[in-house]
Amino acid sequence: MCIRDSNLPALVVADERTWAVAGKAVDAGLRSAGVVACDPLVFPAEPCLYASLDNAHTIADRLRTLDAETGSAVVPIAVGSGTINDLTKLAAKDVGRRYAVVGTAASMDGYTGAGAPISDNGVKVTMQCVAPQVVIFDLDITAAAPQVMTASGYGDLAAKIPGGADWIIADAAGIEPLDQHVWALVQSGVRDALSRPDDLRRGDPEAFSGLVEGLILSGLAMQVYDGTRPASGAEHYFSHIWELAHVGADRNPPLSHGHKVAIGTLAMLAFYEKFLDRDLSRLDIDAAVAAWPDWRTVESDIRSTFEGALADHAVKETKVKYVDADGLRARLNRVVDRWHETRAALEKQLVRARVFADQLRRAGAPSRPEDIGLTAADVRATFPKAMYYRSRYTVLDLAREAGWYEELVEEVFAPDGLWT
C-alpha cells in the first residue's frame, strides 16, 4: 500500500494518548508527503476506550461521510495498540477496504491478525475481518510505551510455549496435524524474543525488536493457517473464562488479555510438568476405555460446571472433540504408539513453570494469581472450564482420556506446587 501513489485520502484514527505519542507525527508526515489527510478521528483518553461495536460504527460512519465529501475511498490508519487496531479493523471491513496500522506498544499479537475481538451487547466475540495491509513500528516509541503494556505483550507471546505443546499433542492424536511452515513462523524466534525480560522492563529499544517481531509473526501465522491454533492453546481459555467473569475489568486501564494469559500459561506449564512425570507409554488402555464416561455423563458434568448460555456453548464445543469408547481406544493407541517421539518434542518445547514465572516477574508481567486479583483456588476452579470451553484438543483432554486429569490438577496445587 502506498497512499501517496494511490492518490487516496487518509484518516488517522487514534485516542488522545496515541495521538500525542505518534498520531500527530503520522498525520504531519502524510501531509508533507502530499497526501490528503482528513481531519483525524481522535477518541478521548478517558474513560478508557472500549472495543465495542458502537465505537467501530463511529469510525465506519466517519469513513462513509468522508468518502462522500472527497469522492474517494478514504484509507483508515490506526495509530495505537489493541483497541484502536481492532476497532479500525472492523470499521475497514464494514466499508470494504484495507487499512494500515502504526503500533505504539508491543502489547498483543493481534496487529497482523484477521480477527477483531469486539464487545457486542456485553459479549465478546471475534469478528472475522481483513488483516492490515501495512504494519509499522517505531521501536523507540514502542520502548517508551507504558510498561504494563509491554508486560501484556510478553505474556501473550509467552503463551506460545504451552500453546505449541498443545498442538504437538493434537498432532500426535491425529486431530490437527502440525503445519511446519506455520509452526516455524511462531516458534522459531519465541525463546529469543522472551530472553531479555530485564531489558524489556528497562525500555531498551534493542530488546523490543524480538518481542515486536514475535508478536507480528504470530499474527501472520494465524492468517496463513486461517485459525488461532498456531498461537494459542488451553492457556488462552483460562483468560477467556476470566474475561467472561470480568476479572480486572474495574481497573484503569482494565486488566489486559496478556496479563491474564500469563497466569494461564503458568497454570498449563505446571500441568505439563505433572503430566510428563508419568509415562504414557505404559498406560493401561483397557482400563482407560472401561472408565470412559458416556456423552450423557459428560454433558451433565459440563452443565454442572457452567451456567446458562455458557453451558450450552461448552456442550456444543466439547461434543466436537468427544469420542465414544471405540474412538477413545483408537486415539489412545495412536498416541501411545508415538509417545517416545511426542514426549521428546514436548520436552524440547516446554519450560519449567518456576523458571518461567521468574521471567514473567522480571518482565513486569503477572506471575502469581494475586497479581490479577485471583487466588490459587480460583485458578484451580478454572481448569475444568478451560477443558470444556472450546473444541480445540489440548493436553487437558488427553489427560482426561487417560484417566489422569483430576489427579494431575490435584498435584499442581499440592503443598509443593507453584503457588502453594
Regions found by a protein language model. Name each.
Residues 5, 65-71, 92, 125-130, ...:
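Solvent-exposed alpha-helices and their adjacent loops that cap or buttress functional pockets
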Residues 15-21, 80-86, 107:
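Gly/Ser/Thr-rich loops at beta-strand to alpha-helix junctions
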Residues 39, 48-73, 106, 225-228, ...:
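Non-transmembrane, aqueous-exposed alpha-helical and coiled segments at domain scale
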Residues 66-91, 95-104:
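A short, small-residue-rich loop immediately preceding and capping a beta-strand
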Residues 90-192:
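A glycine/threonine-rich phosphate-anchoring loop and its flanking beta-alpha core
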Residues 278-420:
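C-terminal charged capping/lid subdomain of soluble metabolic enzymes
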